[in-house]
Amino acid sequence: GVSRGMRILGEARAATCNGRDVLKVGSHPALNALLHELPPEMREMEKLPFHLLAAGIVSGNPERAIEEGRYILVPVIAANHEERSVTLTLPPDDGDRVFWAMRQDLAAEDDMRRLVGELADRLGAAPNFGLLFSCLGRGPYFFGGEDRDLEAVKARFPGMPLIGAYGGGQIAPMFNGNQQIHNAAVLALFGAEAAAPSSGSRTTETKAGPRV
């Protein structure tokens, strides 16, 4: 499973785009729309913290797209105060449904606890071991010196063997197939599944089964 750890800012609306520049979101200039959704203290900053901001581009039917994870996150890299436009690292298509999102430690912590709970419910039993891969931008540096993702897993499964690493990105199963993502945490839990014994046999085989 994947924890994106983003705070969603507002609803997805149709965007007017020119290359990598988002000119409008809904009926408002893109920069105005972004500022409207930001926390008040961030709107007053001399320079916006672009390293924390992203645009979510919805795929398919916009209804419940955010809840179902049918979107890609594209980092914001610049804003034009004269044109009131916002520049992304990748060009969206004109008319795409776009929403704004922000990296936030509390949102990431809540999302990781949600993921751990969902995977535990799907597994249905205590896992034998787990794998946790986190982006360098999501580890202790992001959480003020402690890895709250790791703490969430250990709190739910104390004593469970856990292997992991920090990296510059992760490859994870997304709605549109396996994709490389950033600033996220990927968790897999593994448990034993009992295979049905063959007729007349009293032996039982087990095999490791992942829950991603």
Each predicted region: which residue ranges?
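Small-residue-enriched flexible segments
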Residues: 1-143, 147-160, 165-212
